[in-house]
């Protein structure tokens, strides 16, 4: 997969800088072996685009909070709109000015860290249940 991606980038964009500036989500989704999560990761982390990566951890967290989504896009748009609407407050909490793509990176990393601490397989750990209860109180 990686070899095919690199070859496609070189053949289409000639170099990484041109790719980072001009690659589209649709173009990447047409690369064999790349799905939404991988494509959004490339666009956010490599290309510094304003797109949030969501994954199975994000889905589990949303489900534990009482939300259900039909597909990846609904899940991404839900979390992405929440981060975007709170951009100013999040920057204050972090005590620095952050671009939206950076906030998406931080938010995704926090979800991953939370999930690794809170889930034992598909089930919440006792500590995870405690944290989810606190989060639900703030909703």
What is the predicted role of each segment?
Residues 1-139:
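Catalytic cores of DNA base-excision repair glycosylases
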């Amino acid at each position: 997969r990686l070899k095919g991606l690199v070859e496609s980038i070189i053949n289409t964009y000639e170099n990484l800088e041109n790719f980072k500036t001009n690659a589209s989500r649709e173009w990447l989704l047409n690369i064999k072996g790349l799905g939404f999560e991988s494509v959004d990761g490339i666009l956010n982390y490599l290309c510094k685009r304003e797109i949030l990566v969501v994954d199975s951890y994000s889905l589990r967290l949303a489900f534990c909070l009482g939300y259900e989504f039909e597909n990846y896009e609904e899940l991404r748009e839900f979390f992405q709109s929440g981060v975007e609407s709170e951009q100013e407050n999040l920057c204050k909490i972090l005590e620095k000015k952050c671009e939206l793509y950076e906030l998406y990176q931080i938010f995704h990393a926090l979800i991953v860290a939370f999930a690794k601490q809170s889930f034992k397989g598909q089930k919440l750990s006792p500590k995870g249940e405690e944290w989810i209860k606190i989060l639900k109180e703030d909703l």
